[in-house]
Amino acid sequence: MKDLVLYMTIGYPDENTFFRMLDMLDEEKVPVLELGIPVGNPFVDGDLIRQSHKKVLDSGIGQKKIIRWLQRIRRDYKFCIILMTYKEGMERFCLSELDKNLYDGILCVDEVIRADTGMRPVQIYNETMTEVQMLSLLAENKNFAYVMSGNGKTGSFSCLPDGYKRTVHFLKKNTNLPVYVGFGIKTLKDVNAVCSHGA
């Protein structure tokens, strides 16, 4: 499972259940965990993730709780930790102020985080980008390149789009970073499809 990245909203549905699920992921040796930092308007996410964000926000999450959870995750688990959020989450929880040893990288959906911040950013690519735009993002990219399988919200695709194929092909030619495909990957058939096209 060295190329598997799983997403979970931090603290969802509650602290105890969240950490029990992390125990299971650790036992299965999941290599990379994308931790969603909740926001009020996760506009590229589908209903399930939107609901999870709302539940965690309603529970009263703040920066101190995020730090405490990240410290526990760092102490108890082996997987790589990628924080995934929006500009709203960056600002609301002052994520740029976090100890950078608490996580391995950060992905911000609607703002480019520069590599010189030391936050080891993961950049997002999609089929609408030009080659110049993708090369510009690669210069700011650490950890891995994240390719959206298509345009739309997570969970909104009735079948896997194929617009990602050109993007994956271009990135593989221009970087040694791993290239992962996300959004709309729901079945074993989907997994096999993206793997067969270089992801």
Give residue ranges: language-model regions:
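Hydrophobic faces of well-ordered beta-strands that scaffold small-molecule active sites
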Residues: 4-8, 33-35, 79-85, 106-108, ...
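Conserved N-terminal beta1-alpha1 strand-loop-helix module at the mouth
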Residues: 1-77, 139-142
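Hydrophobic, well-structured mid-protein blocks that either form specific transmembrane helices
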Residues: 91-127
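Glycine/Thr-rich beta-alpha phosphate-binding loop at enzyme active sites
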Residues: 49, 133-170
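Catalytic cores of alpha/beta
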Residues: 15-27, 95-96, 129-140, 174-175, ...
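Alpha-helix-loop-beta-strand connector modules within alpha/beta enzyme cores
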Residues: 46-82, 117-127, 160-181, 185
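Glycine-rich phosphate-binding active-site loops on the catalytic face of alpha/beta enzymes
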Residues: 31-42, 102-115, 146-155, 184, ...
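Ordered, amphipathic secondary-structure segments that act as subunit-interaction surfaces
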Residues: 77-95
